[in-house]
Each structure stands twice: as C-alpha cells, then as structure tokens.
Design a protein with these regions (language model features):
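Conserved hydrophobic beta-strand within the GNAT/NAT acetyltransferase core sheet
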Residues: 109-112, 217, 251-255
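Conserved active-site alpha-helix within GNAT-family acetyltransferase domains
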Residues: 114-131, 229, 233, 257-275
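Conserved acetyl-CoA-binding loop-helix of GNAT-fold acetyltransferases
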Residues: 86-99, 222, 228-241, 245, ...
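C-terminal "cap" of GNAT-fold acetyltransferases
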Residues: 134-157, 249, 254-260, 268-285
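Helix-loop element at the rim of GNAT/NAT acetyltransferase active sites that forms part
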Residues: 25-38, 166-178
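A short beta-loop-alpha structural element at the N-terminal edge
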Residues: 5-23, 152-164, 274
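Acyl-donor-binding surface of acyltransferase catalytic domains
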Residues: 1-4, 71, 81-149, 279-285
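Conserved donor-binding loop and adjoining core beta-sheet/short helix segment
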Residues: 38-92, 198, 206-218, 223
C-alpha cells in the first residue's frame, strides 16, 4: 500500500522553466510514457508549476503531472526515463502524491489507462479496478440544435469556478466529480470552455481542446435538475461551431462504459464507439 512503501532515494520537486527542454525531450523520447494531455501543453504546465520531477542525486529519472483536488485526484501524466527503474519512480511519485491527496481530503486517486509498464506497479501499491471508459467519435462538426432563448451561452471566466463545480457535483456521482482545482486547470488549459446560464445562473458547462482537425470534448455537465431539456445539445452545437471555425472537422470524447444514459445521449448526436474501453484504477483514501 502507498503508506507502507519503503522510502527511496528519489526526491520530488516542481520543474522550473529552465528545465522545460529536458521535460519535453523526456516526454517525447521515453519508451514509458503515460500522458492524458497534449504534449505541446508541457511548457505551460511547467510554468504553472504542475510538472513534478523525480530526481536521484540531481539526475532526472522521471516526471509526473497529477491534479491534487477534492473530491478526487488524478494522475494525468507519468514518464520514466529510459534505463531508470519504473518501481523507484512510481514509488517516489506515489509517496509524494498520497500525503498531498490526504491534505485536501480527497476520496480517491485515479489513473485511466492500460499501460503494461505502469499498471502492475500501481496495483502493487493498492490501486484497484474501478470501471472503464469508452471513446466515442463523431466524424462531422455539423449539428442541428433547437435554440431555447431562456438559456444563454458564454465563455467561462475565472470567477465562475465555484458555480461550475456546483453544476459538476450535481451532475456526477462522487467518484467522478471535479473539484475547484481541476476546473481551474481546465480553464487555464482548454481553448474552449463554455457555460450555459439561465437568469445569470450557471446550469451547465462544456470544455474541450483540439488535435489538428480533431476536437475533443473533455467534459460536458448539465445540472441534474435541468437535464433532458436540450441544454447539452445546445452546448455541443456551440462548441462544434466554434471548433469548426478553427478548422476542426471531427470530434471525440470519453464517457463511462456503464453510463448508459450518457452513451445514449451521445449516440443520438451521431457519436459511435471507436476502440476498446480503457480501464480506470483508483486508490481509495
């Protein structure tokens, strides 16, 4: 278990801007890479203090990007340098992450993926299977949506974080909820982040990014009391419209394999499954 892992001689500290080139080289050329973000985001992540380095006697052995948040933390990136021990790097990362997660009273630490070089070490330290997510794809950005003028759509702002978190918590079960830190990171990283309001109150949000001509929806949440009223479709339409203006021609997203309501909604919009599901592992705190 994490709290019983033996201490190693690796130290963890935040990367500095002067180390950005080393961070990028490691992420691009290592044979053990787990990234759930675009690699070109690394310079910004370093500047924002999110990239943590695993060092041994001052030598770079690996790096990680983990969102430490309440109610859930997530491992969004982990890289091990060629020739270095996966066990030592993963152990050092988890020994750093566990106290940080406990300090914010997190429910869990999540990892999404099936990396054969990484999963056994996470399982050894107490991570357990916790469902799967499925990737869906839509090969077109054309989408018709009825406009309900009671609901307005605008870009999210920094002062919206608390209201966005409230919507997220009303839409998802506890282990899938995003907290304020996650939303702040999304606001900083996502080129597309929209909210839907009624009477000035935020009732839904959508955020995403793009990879060349393919857009990706990172999150869509509608307050539970206002679902099935076309708000999600309206937000998706607005997101697709804005992405299309930037040259995007198709869209992807992920949803829980056992969330049949969510899958039915996305399929009604023209999405279809594209690959086998990815596993979710959690360390429960």
């Amino acid at each position: 278990m994490l709290n019983r892992a033996r201490k190693q001689d690796l130290t963890i500290r935040a990367a500095t801007p002067t180390e950005t080139e080393d961070v990028e080289l490691l992420a691009r050329w290592s044979d053990r890479v787990h990234l759930r973000f675009q690699i070109n985001c690394l310079p910004q992540l370093v500047r924002d203090g999110h990239i943590m380095l695993a060092l041994q006697n001052g030598n770079l052995c690996g790096l990680t990007y983990a969102t430490v948040d309440h109610p859930n933390c997530s491992i969004r990136g982990l890289v091990v340098r060629p020739g270095r021990s996966t066990a030592l790097v993963v152990g050092a990362v988890l020994n750093y992450l566990l106290p940080a997660a406990k300090a914010v009273d997190a429910l869990s630490i999540a990892y999404i993926g099936d990396d054969p070089w990484l999963v056994p070490f996470l399982v050894e330290r107490g991570f357990l299977p916790s469902g799967q997510i499925i990737a869906l794809r839509r090969p077109s950005v054309s989408l018709t949506a009825e406009v309900d003028h009671r609901y307005q759509v605008r870009c999210a702002r920094a002062e919206d974080v608390e209201a966005i978190v409230a919507v997220d918590w009303a839409a998802f079960e506890p282990l899938w909820r995003n907290g304020a830190q996650t939303i702040r990171e999304f606001l900083a990283q996502m080129p597309y982040f929209l909210v839907s309001t009624v009477g000035g109150r935020i009732v839904a949000y959508i955020c995403g990014t793009s990879y060349g001509k393919v857009g990706h929806v990172v999150r869509l949440a509608v307050h539970k009391q206002l679902q099935r009223r076309g708000i999600g479709t309206m937000l998706m339409h607005e997101l697709l419209t804005r992405m299309a203006e930037e040259g995007v021609r198709g869209l992807t997203l992920n949803t829980q394999l056992d969330n049949y309501g969510s899958q039915a909604f996305y399929r009604s919009l023209g999405f279809y499954a594209t690959q086998k599901p990815a596993s979710v592992y959690r360390y429960m705190l």
